[in-house]
């Protein structure tokens, strides 16, 4: 049976490693420029790093972690490589973050539009909450400009800080006023306050007033230290971790339901 309905890809991503290399350093406030991610030389090519020691991966690399592409390791990446994605990336052709080139790749896959999640994971790896908030502001501005090129094909989800409710509210209100984005994503970290906590109340109200759906993206549970394990134990632990990766969101759903947020 052939599907004749338009395909909307509801879980797509913009990864930091495919963003313009000077995006954050050029657009950050003067007091925070030295704390922003930037691109420098690495042994396998240009890499994204920060001065406090955070590592984000190879520029235009594979997946959100910016890994080096290894043929035969991940079938989805093999398909992307077959279309020249990673070779183009080495040449500085950012197909994933150039709106016209991304639309061409959508057409190649028969996709009519994408919901685009952002850089919350990378912001957490920065381990600098104030700088991460600035990083998200810059990204959200870039995202709005990106989606504005073809709003019928891109539904951008703004990244919202989760470490401080004042920062979260401020950025939510800013992106709502800015327009273009279609929703906001709140961090779903294991150490954040449960969603039924009163601290979240103002955020829910602000999102509702702005007409912006609130999104959560799974990050899985606590990650085991695979490198400290024997090879077979590591394989088993990884299989358990990756199989249960999506189940972590059941906790968030229960917090929403029993917090009365859906009533």
Give the role of each language-model region:
Residues 1-263:
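Helix-coil boundary/capping segments in enzymes
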């Amino acid at each position: 049976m052939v599907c004749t309905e338009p395909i909307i890809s509801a879980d797509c991503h913009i990864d930091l490693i495919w963003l313009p290399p000077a995006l954050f350093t050029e657009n950050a406030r003067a007091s925070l420029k030295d704390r922003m991610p930037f691109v420098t030389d690495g042994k396998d090519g240009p890499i994204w790093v920060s001065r406090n020691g955070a590592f984000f991966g190879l520029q235009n690399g594979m997946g959100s972690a910016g890994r080096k592409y290894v043929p035969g390791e991940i079938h989805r990446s093999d398909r992307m490589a077959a279309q020249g994605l990673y070779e183009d990336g080495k040449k500085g052709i950012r197909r994933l973050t150039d709106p016209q080139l991304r639309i061409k790749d959508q057409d190649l896959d028969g996709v009519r539009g994408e919901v685009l999640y952002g850089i919350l994971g990378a912001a957490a790896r920065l381990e600098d909450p104030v700088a991460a908030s600035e990083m998200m502001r810059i990204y959200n501005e870039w995202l709005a400009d990106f989606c504005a090129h073809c709003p019928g094909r891109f539904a951008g989800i703004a990244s919202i800080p989760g470490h401080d409710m004042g920062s979260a509210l401020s950025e939510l209100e800013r992106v709502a006023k800015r327009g273009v984005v279609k929703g906001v994503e709140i961090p779903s970290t294991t150490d954040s306050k449960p969603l039924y906590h009163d601290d979240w109340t103002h955020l829910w109200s602000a999102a509702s007033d702005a007409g912006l759906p609130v999104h959560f993206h799974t990050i899985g549970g606590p990650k085991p230290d695979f490198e400290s394990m024997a090879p077979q134990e590591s394989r088993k632990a990884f299989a358990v971790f990756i199989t249960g990766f999506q189940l972590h969101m059941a906790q968030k759903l229960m917090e929403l339901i029993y917090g009365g947020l859906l009533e």
